[in-house]
């Protein structure tokens, strides 16, 4: 469950290292984001000489959460960190690589490009 003011790691090579969620995309009073949801975030840490700079406003999709996520088949999945992938307006990732495991629910949310770049899909 990601809410405003939550810090997230970045799971791609776009140049950002840490993000802070400032808005959950959806209905006007939506409080939390889960795996596969889009957020608006600000870059808190960035790698030098990369396209994404510190204090830049970006869109990102949640790929891992510490909070348990219950699947339809009854199994529960949770990760060690909160992580997101920076995307553009069309929903394609800005980076060319994705690090760490990715949840299978992203395929159902039509983020197939992120799933294809991921080294492991759980």
From Swiss-Prot:
<keyword id="KW-0699">rRNA-binding</keyword>
<comment type="similarity">
    <text>Belongs to the universal ribosomal protein uL14 family.</text>
</comment>
<dbReference type="GO" id="GO:0006412">
    <property type="term" value="P:translation"/>
</dbReference>
<keyword id="KW-0694">RNA-binding</keyword>
<keyword id="KW-0689">Ribosomal protein</keyword>
<comment type="function">
    <text>Binds to 23S rRNA.</text>
</comment>
<keyword id="KW-0934">Plastid</keyword>
<dbReference type="InterPro" id="IPR036853">
    <property type="entry name" value="Ribosomal_uL14_sf"/>
</dbReference>
<dbReference type="InterPro" id="IPR000218">
    <property type="entry name" value="Ribosomal_uL14"/>
</dbReference>
<protein>
    <recommendedName>
        <fullName>Large ribosomal subunit protein uL14c</fullName>
    </recommendedName>
</protein>
<dbReference type="InterPro" id="IPR005745">
    <property type="entry name" value="Ribosomal_uL14_bac-type"/>
</dbReference>
<dbReference type="GO" id="GO:0003735">
    <property type="term" value="F:structural constituent of ribosome"/>
</dbReference>
<comment type="subunit">
    <text>Part of the 50S ribosomal subunit.</text>
</comment>
<dbReference type="GO" id="GO:0009507">
    <property type="term" value="C:chloroplast"/>
</dbReference>
<keyword id="KW-0687">Ribonucleoprotein</keyword>
<dbReference type="Pfam" id="PF00238">
    <property type="entry name" value="Ribosomal_L14"/>
</dbReference>
<dbReference type="GO" id="GO:0019843">
    <property type="term" value="F:rRNA binding"/>
</dbReference>
<dbReference type="InterPro" id="IPR019972">
    <property type="entry name" value="Ribosomal_uL14_CS"/>
</dbReference>
<keyword id="KW-0150">Chloroplast</keyword>
<dbReference type="GO" id="GO:0015934">
    <property type="term" value="C:large ribosomal subunit"/>
</dbReference>
């Amino acid at each position: 469950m990601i809410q405003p003011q939550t810090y997230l790691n970045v799971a791609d090579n776009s140049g950002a290292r840490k993000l802070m969620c400032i808005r959950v995309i959806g209905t006007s009073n939506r409080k939390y984001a889960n795996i596969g949801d889009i957020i608006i975030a600000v870059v808190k840490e960035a790698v030098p000489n990369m396209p994404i700079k510190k204090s830049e406003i970006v869109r990102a999709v949640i790929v891992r959460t510490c909070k348990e996520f219950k699947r339809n088949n009854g199994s529960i999945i949770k990760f060690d960190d909160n992580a997101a992938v920076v995307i553009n307006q069309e929903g394609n990732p800005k980076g060319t690589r994705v690090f760490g495991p990715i949840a299978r629910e992203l395929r159902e949310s039509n983020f197939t490009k992120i799933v294809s770049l991921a080294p492991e899909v759980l």
